[in-house]
Every structure is written in structure tokens, then in C-alpha cells.
């Protein structure tokens, strides 16, 4: 585990701890709603966010990010009314588009290794080690797709339209986890790929 992972997993753990302190009183007030699905989904979200922060595997990190999208959608629908249904579907659809772009960017990054004549890999450490060999056009295309894809999960403009509805309809603790936890995980993904891009350019300049 690297220092960046420790920082993010520590922040997410603290965020979940604070939400866990708030959750019992909130759920007692909302006793008319069955909270078993909400609590189960939140526990899975904690596991998936932790996996994102600790993973050094490109594919595993993407799977964990996709899982957070699927598992948090029922949390947005907690109120079970037409507005929360619309918000959850908007969140799910826009988030899925973003994560699909991130998957395409991941494919491009692996293909950049193949184009450079290197063995394809999904491990970040190996990608960083061989980043100076990556095919520059495919590397740039991969970074743009990954930035847009994971930027959608962060709610960056213009793919931010899901945020007002999702934050407005979700319970307060779910909104906090979306704003603090999910955004942080997506930002970490962008940082991982930015590191590869930065090292790739640094290696080329050093060789030049």
C-alpha cells in the first residue's frame, strides 16, 4: 500500500465512521422505510471504495468503481417516490456512461503498451515502469477518456447533471458519501492515470 492509498482509505474510513454515528438516529426517524437494503448497500459501498483505494490493478479498480455506481443507486431511491426514481435512474445512466468511457480509456492504455511492442499489463506499477515506452497518441487518447469517464463520477461539468437530483433525493448520509467518498475514489483514479502520463512525458524528456 502506497502513501496515496493510505491517505484516501483513511479519509474514506473517517467519512464512513462519521456517517455511521449519524445513521441510527436518522433511521429511527425514518422507521416507515425498510432500512435493510440501505444498510446492506452502504456496507458494500464501503468495501468497494476501500478496494478502489487499495487496488493497484487497472481492471480491479474499474470493477470496484462500477460496483459503487450499481450499489449506490438503490440508496438514492430510498424515499421511493417519482422524484427519487428519476434521480436514481439519471444517476445510474449518466454514471454508467462515464464508467464505460473509463473502460474504453483503460483499453486504450493497454493498447498503448501493445503498440509500443511491450507486453500488455494491468498493474499500475508495471505501467509506470514502462510508461516511457507507451505509444503517445494512444496514451493521450486514453487519458482524455479516463478523465472524462472518472470525471463524470466526480460530477465535473458538463457531466454533472446527475448531482442536484441525486443529492437532493438521497438521505443525507448517502449524499455525504457520494460527495465525499465516491468523488474521492474517482479523483484517485484520475491521479493514478495522471501519474502514468506525467512519468511517460518525464521519461521521454530525460531520454531526449
Feature roles, as predicted:
Residues 173-174, 180-187:
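Loop-to-transmembrane helix boundary motifs in multi-pass membrane proteins
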Amino acid at each position: 500500500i502506497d502513501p496515496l492509498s493510505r491517505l484516501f482509505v483513511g479519509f474514506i474510513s473517517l467519512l464512513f465512521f462519521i456517517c455511521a454515528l449519524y445513521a441510527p438516529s436518522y433511521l429511527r426517524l425514518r422507521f416507515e422505510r425498510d432500512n435493510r437494503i440501505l444498510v446492506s448497500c452502504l456496507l458494500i459501498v464501503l468495501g468497494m471504495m476501500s478496494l478502489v483505494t487499495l487496488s493497484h490493478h487497472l481492471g480491479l479498480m474499474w470493477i470496484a468503481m462500477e460496483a459503487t455506481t450499481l450499489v449506490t443507486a438503490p440508496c438514492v431511491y430510498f424515499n421511493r417516490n417519482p422524484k427519487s426514481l428519476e434521480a436514481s435512474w439519471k444517476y445510474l445512466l449518466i454514471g454508467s456512461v462515464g464508467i464505460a468511457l473509463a473502460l474504453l480509456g483503460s483499453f486504450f492504455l493497454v493498447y498503448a503498451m501493445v503498440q509500443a511492442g511491450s507486453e500488455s499489463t494491468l498493474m499500475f506499477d508495471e505501467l509506470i515502469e514502462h510508461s516511457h515506452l507507451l505509444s503517445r497518441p494512444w496514451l493521450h487518447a486514453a487519458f482524455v477518456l479516463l478523465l472524462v469517464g472518472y470525471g463524470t463520477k466526480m460530477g465535473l461539468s458538463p457531466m454533472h447533471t446527475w448531482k442536484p437530483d441525486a443529492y437532493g433525493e438521497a438521505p443525507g448520509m448517502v449524499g455525504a458519501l457520494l460527495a465525499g467518498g465516491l468523488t474521492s475514489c474517482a479523483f484517485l483514479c484520475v491521479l493514478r492515470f495522471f501519474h502514468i502520463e506525467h512519468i511517460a512525458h518525464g521519461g521521454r524528456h530525460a531520454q531526449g
